[in-house]
Amino acid sequence: MQSRLSDWLVKHELVHRSLGFDYQGIETLQIKTEDWDSIAVISYIYGYNYLRSQCAYDVAPGGFLASVYHLTRIQYGIDKVEEVCLKVFVSRNNPRIPSVFWIWKSADFQERESYDMLGISYANHPHLKRILMPESWIGWPLRKDYITPNFYEIQDAR
């Protein structure tokens, strides 16, 4: 069984890989970085008009980083929405993915947080800068190979 989007991608010979279904029956698809721009636009045109969430994680120390997109197809008069999860894996040596801010505005802060915590650079994002850590912070705190700095700021508790 495949999601409707997966069926459509197969029919139009767009390469992707199914990673299975979650407990709610939502399919997760792996998308190649070089295809992400076009598949994101196709997903929107196909009706996935709402980016429910975007997050990222470090797959393994020294391994790939993943950017995850939970898309929802919301239509007036339809009680059950259709959902799909898309994952884009990138090398930690060059973690660059096209931004989807221009398709789903809700990606703005979410992509910025993924950049700030894991160092994934979202190409063509209009405000890509740190959102949680100070601009002077060195490194990416949620990477599994991150080494915590050897300093602690002592504040006066008076």
From Swiss-Prot:
Q: What class of enzyme is it?
A: translocase
Which molecular-function annotations from GO does this UniProt entry contain?
NADH dehydrogenase (ubiquinone) activity; quinone binding
For this protein, the record's PROSITE patterns field holds:
COMPLEX1_30K
Keyword annotations for this protein, in alphabetical order, are: Chloroplast, Membrane, NAD, NADP, Plastid, Plastoquinone, Quinone, Thylakoid, Translocase, Transport
What is the annotated localization of this protein? Plastid, Chloroplast thylakoid membrane
The record's GO CC annotations read: chloroplast thylakoid membrane
Say yes or no: keyword Chloroplast present.
yes
| A biological process from GO | photosynthesis, light reaction
Q: InterPro entries, per this entry?
A: NADH_DH_suC, NADH_quin_OxRdtase_su_C/D-like, NADH_UbQ_OxRdtase_30kDa_su, NADH_UbQ_OxRdtase_CS
The record ties this protein, via Pfam families, to: Complex1_30kDa
Q: Spell out the reaction equation it catalyses.
A: a plastoquinone + NADH + (n+1) H(+)(in) = a plastoquinol + NAD(+) + n H(+)(out); a plastoquinone + NADPH + (n+1) H(+)(in) = a plastoquinol + NADP(+) + n H(+)(out)
Q: Which cysteines are joined by disulfide bonds?
A: none
**Would you say which domain of life the source belongs to?**
Eukaryota
How does the protein's chain sit in the membrane according to the entry?
Answer: Peripheral membrane protein
Q: What is its EC number?
A: 7.1.1.-
Q: Which family does it belong to?
A: Belongs to the complex I 30 kDa subunit family.
Q: What does this protein do?
A: NDH shuttles electrons from NAD(P)H:plastoquinone, via FMN and iron-sulfur (Fe-S) centers, to quinones in the photosynthetic chain and possibly in a chloroplast respiratory chain. The immediate electron acceptor for the enzyme in this species is believed to be plastoquinone. Couples the redox reaction to proton translocation, and thus conserves the redox energy in a proton gradient.
Q: How does it assemble?
A: NDH is composed of at least 16 different subunits, 5 of which are encoded in the nucleus.
Q: What is this protein called?
A: NAD(P)H-quinone oxidoreductase subunit J, chloroplastic
**Species the sequence originates in:** Dioscorea elephantipes
Q: Taxonomy-wise, where does this protein's organism fall, top ranks first?
A: Eukaryota, Viridiplantae, Streptophyta, Embryophyta, Tracheophyta
